[in-house]
């Protein structure tokens, strides 16, 4: 797969500016690294690969914040259509660190707002007045009510179609650590693919994934990571998806 990525046409961060898709429709898929190699091979002439810092597979660290009672987790678990997630994200290839608010509305669209913050505030931004004002203006939560919850690390491939109308992110080597319980977990060979578009429209990658029997699946890295690392949360909605990951990777993730 690495050789195929190196053979593809690249795209820079500057060129990506026109297709940030901060207000978008997301479609997620679950597969394995073995199948991913075939996906990348078939997409190699139709998509360009993001290159940052000379790398085409880039590392990301993310810290998800939540209330003491995991309100954002339960909003998702309880199928609330309008919900938010708040996180800090560190881009290891570029060195940038951002505070982000993701909002999903009842029409299935995702809007993301973010500001850059000092890297020292990755684990806590509450002392930063500008960051606190950002949270107050862009989210439904008070900064004082938020606490570090689930840390998530992964490696990502980002593809952009030649028409520059969509982006595809491929997250692998997913690992989680709960800051409250100290419990860690990994997803092994599992890969989460996310197609990001302005709306529901034709996409070459949808045909490639369908041909390889990779079907859409609604899945949240934060919720999966929380289920695997926080024994006290209710998890009934996510159990089926955890079992799907276990079956796909032949790895036991959760005690029965």
Regions found by a protein language model. Name each.
Residues 1-256:
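Phosphate-end processing signature that detects enzymes handling 5′-triphosphorylated RNA
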């Amino acid at each position: 797969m690495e050789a195929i990525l190196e053979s593809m046409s690249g795209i820079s961060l500057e060129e990506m500016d026109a297709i940030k898709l901060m207000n978008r429709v997301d479609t997620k898929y679950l597969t394995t690294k073995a199948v991913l190699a075939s996906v990348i091979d078939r997409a190699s002439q139709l998509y360009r690969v993001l290159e940052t810092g000379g790398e085409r597979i880039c590392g990301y660290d993310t810290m998800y914040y939540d209330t003491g009672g995991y309100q954002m987790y339960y909003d998702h678990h309880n199928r609330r259509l309008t919900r938010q997630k708040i996180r800090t994200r560190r881009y290891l290839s570029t060195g940038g660190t951002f505070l982000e608010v993701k909002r999903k509305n009842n029409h299935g669209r995702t809007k993301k707002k973010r500001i850059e913050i000092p890297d020292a505030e990755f684990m806590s931004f509450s002392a930063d007045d500008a960051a606190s004002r950002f949270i107050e203006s862009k989210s439904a939560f008070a900064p004082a009510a938020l606490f570090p919850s689930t840390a998530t690390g992964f490696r990502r491939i980002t593809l952009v179609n030649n028409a520059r109308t969509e982006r595809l992110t491929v997250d692998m080597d997913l690992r989680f650590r709960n800051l409250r319980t100290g419990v860690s977990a990994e997803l092994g060979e599992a890969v989460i693919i996310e197609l990001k578009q302005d709306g529901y429209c034709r996409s070459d990658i949808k045909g490639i994934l369908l041909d390889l029997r990779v079907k859409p699946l609604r899945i949240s890295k934060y919720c999966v990571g929380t289920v695997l690392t926080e024994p006290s949360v209710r998890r009934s909605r996510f159990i089926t998806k955890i079992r799907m990951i276990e079956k796909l990777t032949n790895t036991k993730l959760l005690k029965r």
